[in-house]
């Protein structure tokens, strides 16, 4: 059976760790002037993916 392909977009966005799957928040690249300081601060830390979405991400990352 051939090797399974890794979804390269997902590989760049998610990282498997012992605590779960880590990801960075969206909407933090540019045009941040309209966002409040509180909102930008809350988007700062990386987060762990919710359990309901783990199966879909793991399907895209077969070797993670």
From Swiss-Prot:
GO terms for cellular component: cytosolic large ribosomal subunit. Keywords: Ribonucleoprotein, Ribosomal protein. GO terms for biological process: translation. GO terms for molecular function: structural constituent of ribosome. PANTHER family: 54S RIBOSOMAL PROTEIN BL35M, LARGE RIBOSOMAL SUBUNIT PROTEIN BL35M. Belongs to the bacterial ribosomal protein bL35 family. This is Large ribosomal subunit protein bL35. The gene is rpmI.
């Amino acid at each position: 059976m051939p090797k399974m392909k890794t979804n390269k977009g997902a590989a760049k966005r998610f990282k498997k760790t012992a605590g779960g799957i880590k990801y960075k928040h969206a909407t933090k690249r540019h045009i941040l002037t309209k966002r409040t300081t509180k909102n930008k601060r809350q988007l700062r830390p990386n987060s762990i993916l919710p359990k309901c979405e783990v199966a879909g991400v793991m399907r895209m990352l077969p070797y993670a």
